[in-house]
Amino acid sequence: MATMSAETISSQPSAGDLSGWNERMGCEKKGVPMTTRKLARLAALALSTLALAAAAQHKEGASAPEVNYQAGTSPLADVAMYQSSNPKAPKMTQAEFDRARQIYFERCAGCHGVLRKGATGKPLTPDVTLPKGTDYLKVFIAYGSPAGMPNWQTSGEMSEADVDLMARYIQQDPPVPPEYGLADMKKTWKVVIPADQRPKKKMNNYNITNIFSTTLRDAGEIALIDGDTKEIISIIKTGYAVHISRMSASGRYLFVIGRDAKVNMIDLWMEKPDTVAEIRTGLEARSVESSKFKGFEDKYAIAGTYWPPQFVIMDGDTLEPLKIVSTRGNVVGTQEYHPEPRVASIVGSHFKPEFVVNVKETGKTLMVDYSNLNALKMTEIGSAPFLHDGGLDATKRYFMVAANNSNKISVFDLKDSKLAAIVDVGKIPHPGRGANFNHPKYGPVWATGHLGDETISLIGTDPKKHKQYAFKEVAKLKGPGGGALFIKSHPKSNHLYSDAPLNPDPKISQSVVVYDMKNLDKGYVTLPIAEWAGIKDDGAKRVVQPEFNKAGDEVWFSVWSAKDKISAMVVVDDKTLKLKKVIKDPRLITPTGHFNVYNTQHDVY
């Protein structure tokens, strides 16, 4: 966080205007004004709180897109947890504790961690919070900090009573969510259609290679959409807020995982594609993948969880859980023990029988050899903390993963199982899978956008023919603003597309930008995707995730609004950059991520 500037400090109340500040601070109790002395103390407390907060965080501060991204709801909000008794902490009833715990996991856990040990935000454990006291913490929660701590009360997100509740809650011992082991998983494991009773051949007339799997976030569903006819094939119940869709190596099975760690295995050969097996692998999750290496196609699936911090390898036909591995361990660099390092992205290697498992807080990438689960071998490679999402280069040999809060891209050689490079990029890189294309000067490059700034970083990926540019940031493209989540291209396209759904400016969040890859110097053109959708209500209409069809001549976008508003899918002609089709249907509730079967199966992006 930035230290407080003179301008910031001068914007705080002086002794002469404390009476007006009294009302703004909510410092009157039962209608009786506070004394000037008490109010002055509170003003000083507020100043010191904000100054300390500013000094404690990242140098440049957090942007609105970063805060929006980190503060997402956790499914742990609905999990019962034990309230321990700490005699030093302020008193809380069980009802107050349960309410505060729910608020914490809905608003705070994404930054401060499940156990309040700190993640991208600072620790909020009793050893830190008790010495500060309730009044100090109330000011901090209510008014936020210049570095990105939200102003929960003044923004209207929390009431004064909520702020008081949370100030007391973070002085309690952190409640620990239950572990989730093999017995728990097997209670949820269900084989809907046994493998030997499934179709022996494709039983439908769909071009399944051009089906799109679209997350219907708040409905707890996915939509399978025919990429040829633009018609919805089916709506399938899933876990909450499916984070990603991944394909089996054969292209037959679709795996999706919700934030609540429920995995669905969907058979695209069925007359009407549907779930054939399901399981819950934990309490919160983001990643699922299947085995890709020759000889192991479709043999295994893997899911990684945020809580408990672990991954599980499953049978590729039935999702039976076979092997659970914890990811708790020590942070790269500091070597401090971390009790909850979350499993972020997972990809299947095309060069070895390995899953590439990225562990967020410890900054470790695990090359997990699945050739013998009874004698499991893992190669642990450290790079930078806060590993998140990423994708393969065009040769599929190199895996590029964002260490988002470290502002770096870690590059791994999947053939030799080693770290190839760590590349400094912009603020909070968020590539999704990223985008591969041939630059006229630098040769093959991989691109990522950023949550925290307006740039797109291009990184060279060819150490043979363009060695001088390999695994370096060779260029930056300028976009309209931060808040980017996904960037995409296609081998048959001349265009590079980038969204910015978390940008606070609706003009930016409701559109996408497109670059001509043969003439990057001329900048971008803007496509008003939300406007093209023709939705007339007051929904947010955030435009999310460019995704090509199999042929590479269409680009699909989600137009995402709240569940009580109208959403849509918009299809654009890649060559002309003109509107081609708007898909509207009452069943398209909060569409966000969407994944083309062929491109996902073959890692084309």
Placement of each model-derived feature along the sequence:
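Structural signature of eukaryotic scaffold interfaces centered on beta-propeller domains
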Residues: 192-206, 247-249, 289-297, 337-351, ...
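Sequence/structural segment immediately N-terminal to covalent heme-attachment motifs in c-type
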Residues: 93-117, 136-143
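Short loop/turn segments immediately following beta-strands, especially the blade-tip
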Residues: 267-270, 316-320, 369-373, 414-418, ...
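Asp-box/WD-like beta-propeller blade repeats and closely related beta-sheet repeat scaffolds
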Residues: 280-300, 304-353, 359-361, 375-381
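Extracytoplasmic electron-transfer domains, predominantly the class I c-type cytochrome c fold
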Residues: 60, 65-71, 115, 119, ...
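A short beta-strand motif characteristic of beta-propeller blades
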Residues: 231-236, 274-279, 320-325, 329-336, ...
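Loop/turn-rich, solvent-exposed surfaces of beta-rich toroidal or solenoidal domains
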Residues: 445-446, 482-564
